[in-house]
Amino acid sequence: MNTQLSLPLKRKNLLEDHFLRYKVLLGNKLKFTNPQTYEVISGLNFAGNSIFDVEKSIASLKRALNFIQKVQANEGIILFIGTRPDLKEIVKYVGSKTNSPYVNDRWSKGLLTNWENTSNSIRFYNLFLKKLGLRAKKKKKIMDTFLGLKNLKKLPDAIFVFDVNADIDVLKEAKSLNIPIIAISDTNVSLNDIDYPILGNSGSILPLAFFSNLIISTFTKKV
């Protein structure tokens, strides 16, 4: 049975309308645009911002969502990551709606590459944190780091990054472990570092919220 996502003509046109409405195609100023993305942009707007090619952006989205479906079908785990302050709530929302682990505060160096230490920290969080009389500031720091990871029992089968440049260290750890990387990929990033780039605007909440709802729909098999 073919499980690949297909977009009928009307659905495709609707998706293009949504891309325009939610400013998905709006990239960075040309001087901040990575030359690697020249082949996926269609030009510049009047303000001098790069504009993604809508067909290529849609194709990248379909490819990424198909991969997410594949991971889900195999009962795999996707770790959602977005440590930029304005992403805190949206990352938590996606994690809770998809019943997936997430990191929306700070990235603890070695979280993936030093998995034994990470798993011990998660175990500590689950078993002891609420019982220990830690100072409020220290307790909050630990809770912010591990709240979204409390159900993570093993290394994830893939990671999803909302802002590549804000979490570049995450990509390095994932690549060293051959963990597939899905990421919203703006015009100022290196596409070579990402296995499943979703070509689109990662600088604003509006397009990220749009992508997030599509991801949630994919998990609930409504796409």
PLM regions and their residue ranges:
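Ribosome large-subunit tunnel/peptidyl-transferase-proximal elements
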Residues: N2-A158, D163-V223
